[in-house]
UniProtKB/Swiss-Prot annotation:
Annotated InterPro entries: Stathmin_CS, Stathmin_fam, Stathmin_sf
Origin species: Homo sapiens (Human)
Gene designation per UniProt: STMN2
GO cellular component: a single term: membrane
Residues in coiled coil: 75-179
Name of the protein: Stathmin-2
Amino acid sequence: MAKTAMAYKEKMKELSMLSLICSCFYPEPRNINIYTYDDMEVKQINKRASGQAFELILKPPSPISEAPRTLASPKKKDLSLEEIQKKLEAAEERRKSQEAQVLKQLAEKREHEREVLQKALEENNNFSKMAEEKLILKMEQIKENREANLAAIIERLQEKERHAAEVRRNKELQVELSG
């Protein structure tokens, strides 16, 4: 059906060109209402302002073409034992080659997976080392800050102690002078 529709489209494209060429060779007017081809007939139904209408009549296939066409297959020659053996050996070689290729691909895939895993482990170790170093550095800073704060507190306490000792001494001097 699709082939017939395609053939119809091609014939319709050729139709106007065909009528032009025919008018050059045959100056007398032709009946343009009917066109006949090998396997179809096209009749013009009527002309309209919007276009033209055609009736397409498909002819049944001719009885000659109905005969089944059988293609003569090439005659098979008798194969000798040596030829059969050669074909079997060639097939075995192909099988071994394919098997070796599959094994090679699997080995390459495993190697790639191993490399990816190794790289991931190295990155994980590097990350762990960097995190540990950052943590140690942070702990050292906290320890230094704590020691600095403790030293500042001790300094303030010692300053208060000196001030208290000075106040006591001044008080004792006042008591001695007044007394």
